[in-house]
């Protein structure tokens, strides 16, 4: 018996040693709101696997709750500036301005907003990198890897200053600029649509013209933020000239929050890993009151409605338009909404400050999902095979819904011009037309039929970078080429010069021969 206990203790010690043999230290530069919800899933899994995770954040986040007891460690810097006004301006812009504009106008407006708040973002960055006590502490900790959401600039600068290899996690940048210019992601414009344009991989001639023009617009004019401003700031912080693409381009792995159940087929680099839906999981039981309401729907089922964590209120007029449409369907509706109760609200609709969205979408009685097209919600719908009514508002949402429309799993309506009839028609279409449910289930089967789960793949590559101090063997040589070398402009120029030289020499030889021939004939005639 004693020997059995000794063997058990020895085995446990061995397991402990093996488990900690791969344990490392992870530093995180996150983005708030829905981005944080996605990244947090990765961090929790890293903790389960024994890693030490430290999150960098400021003192006034929206969803990053650093005060709540957690296995995560937080390094918090004080932000004297209240960002409430900026958030309100952004919500107003997204809800009331952007939906009524064309693609380029909305992108320009969005770009202008980010240029306006660059001072706040710079202040936040400075509060980290010029905090000598914090930077010394971070350097002495010797982190193995840094996980960065590049939507907020400065994470790559932190990694450079700390000399830590880093992994990026993102859905897309504005116009896909960062992935294409800094990550060297191939993007043939003939069949790869520029992100955030609402185009698909099946483009007409005029759409390909539009795609090419928008690519130029995004590349030379509209960018995620003021590149010149940040490159000047980065160069000053590093004490040497640099560019955003130089620092961002040093990413070892790019974790893209999509997968081929969502994306159109396209070429990609070996250090790009698609991990869409990593936050999705089987549905859990609903709260009793909510379950009773769902069961009361009978054979008609339920509709789940959410515009995400950012847009929980709409104007009273818009709320009444929505409520009026919902009141006319036989399904019960669970609507995440914090505003004033609409006067047209039907008895079949209940309002909630918060809903267990994943659990509702996984409920067998769910018939449709009304969504703004956020990536997290889209993937929960794909995971559970639920058809969608898309009401995109801004950013990548138009693109996300366009993908779902192209795959036959969604109907889109315009948020700005939407009427009760539009919403009612869209709901009836996705609920009564069985093709939408069939296509949603097809995407769900594709999503579930992966050799390795998205979350496990994401964690694997983070751990891979930790174990190998990077992933340089996956880095394309394109990073070391100038733009004219990358597009073979120098080769094309050389070949054109060769052709021009050959034509020139041929012409000269021909003219010389003609002159000789003419002289010979004249001499013969004289004789």
UniProtKB/Swiss-Prot annotation:
Domain of life: Eukaryota
Any one annotated GO CC term: membrane
Positions bearing carbohydrate: 313
Keywords annotated in UniProt: Glycoprotein, Glycosyltransferase, Membrane, Signal, Transferase, Transmembrane, Transmembrane helix
TM annotation in the entry: 492-512
Positions on the Cytoplasmic side per record topology: 513-527
Annotated catalysed reactions: glucuronate acceptor + UDP-alpha-D-glucuronate = acceptor beta-D-glucuronoside + UDP + H(+)
GO molecular function, one term: glucuronosyltransferase activity
Enzyme class, first EC level, given as a word: transferase
Pfam family, one: UDPGT
Cell compartments where the protein resides: Membrane
EC number(s) recorded for this UniProt protein: 2.4.1.17
Extracellular side: 24-491
Family, as annotated: Belongs to the UDP-glycosyltransferase family.
Listed name of the protein: UDP-glucuronosyltransferase 2A3
Lineage of the organism: Eukaryota, Metazoa, Chordata, Craniata, Vertebrata
């Amino acid at each position: 018996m004693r020997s059995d206990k000794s063997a058990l203790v020895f085995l446990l010690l061995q397991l402990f040693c093996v488990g900690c043999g791969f344990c490392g230290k992870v530093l995180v530069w996150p983005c708030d709101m829905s981005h944080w919800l996605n990244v947090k899933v990765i961090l929790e899994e890293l903790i389960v696997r024994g890693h030490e995770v430290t999150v960098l954040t400021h003192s006034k986040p929206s969803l990053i709750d650093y005060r709540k007891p957690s296995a995560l460690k937080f390094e918090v810097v004080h932000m004297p500036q209240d960002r409430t006004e900026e958030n309100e301006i952004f919500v107003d812009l997204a809800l009331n301005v952007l939906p009524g504009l064309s693609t380029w106008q909305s992108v320009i407006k969005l770009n202008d907003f980010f240029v306006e708040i660059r001072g706040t973002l710079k202040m936040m960055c400075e509060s980290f990198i010029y905090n000598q006590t914090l930077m010394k502490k971070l350097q002495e900790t010797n982190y193995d890897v840094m996980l960065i959401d590049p939507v907020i600039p400065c994470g790559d600068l932190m990694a450079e200053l700390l000399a830590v290899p880093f992994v990026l996690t993102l859905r897309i940048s504005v116009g896909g600029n960062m992935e294409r210019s800094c990550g060297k992601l191939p993007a043939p414009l003939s069949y790869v649509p520029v992100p955030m344009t609402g185009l698909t991989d099946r483009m007409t001639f005029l759409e390909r013209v539009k795609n090419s023009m928008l690519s130029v617009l995004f590349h030379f004019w509209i960018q995620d933020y003021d590149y010149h401003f940040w490159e000047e700031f980065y160069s000053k912080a590093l004490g040497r000239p640099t560019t955003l693409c130089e620092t961002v381009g040093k990413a070892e792995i790019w974790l893209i929050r999509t997968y081929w159940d969502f994306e159109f087929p396209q070429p990609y680099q070996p250090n790009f890993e698609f991990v869409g839906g990593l936050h999705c999981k089987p549905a859990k039981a609903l709260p009793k009151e909510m379950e009773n309401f769902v069961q009361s729907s009978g054979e008609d089922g339920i509709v789940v409605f959410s515009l995400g964590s950012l847009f929980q209120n709409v104007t009273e007029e818009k709320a009444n338009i929505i409520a009026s449409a919902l009141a006319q369907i036989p399904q019960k509706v669970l609507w995440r909404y914090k505003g004033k109760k609409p006067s047209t609200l039907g008895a079949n609709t209940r309002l909630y400050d918060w809903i267990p969205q994943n659990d509702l979408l996984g409920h067998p009685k769910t018939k449709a999902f009304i969504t703004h097209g956020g990536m997290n919600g889209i993937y929960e719908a794909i995971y559970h095979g639920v058809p969608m009514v898309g009401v995109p508002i801004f950013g990548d949402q138009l693109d996300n819904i366009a993908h779902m429309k192209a795959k036959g799993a969604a109907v889109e309506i315009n948020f700005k011009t939407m009427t009760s009839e539009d919403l009612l028609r869209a709901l009836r279409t996705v609920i009564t037309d069985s093709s939408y449910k069939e296509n949603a289930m097809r995407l769900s089967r594709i999503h579930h039929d992966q050799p390795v789960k998205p979350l496990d793949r994401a964690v694997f590559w983070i751990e891979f970078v930790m174990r190998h101090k990077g992933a340089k063997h996956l880095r394309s040589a394109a990073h070391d080429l100038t733009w004219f070398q990358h597009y073979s402009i120098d080769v094309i120029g050389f070949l054109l010069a060769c052709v021009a030289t050959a034509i020139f020499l041929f012409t000269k030889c021909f003219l010389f021969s003609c002159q000789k021939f003419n002289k010979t004939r004249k001499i013969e005639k004289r004789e």
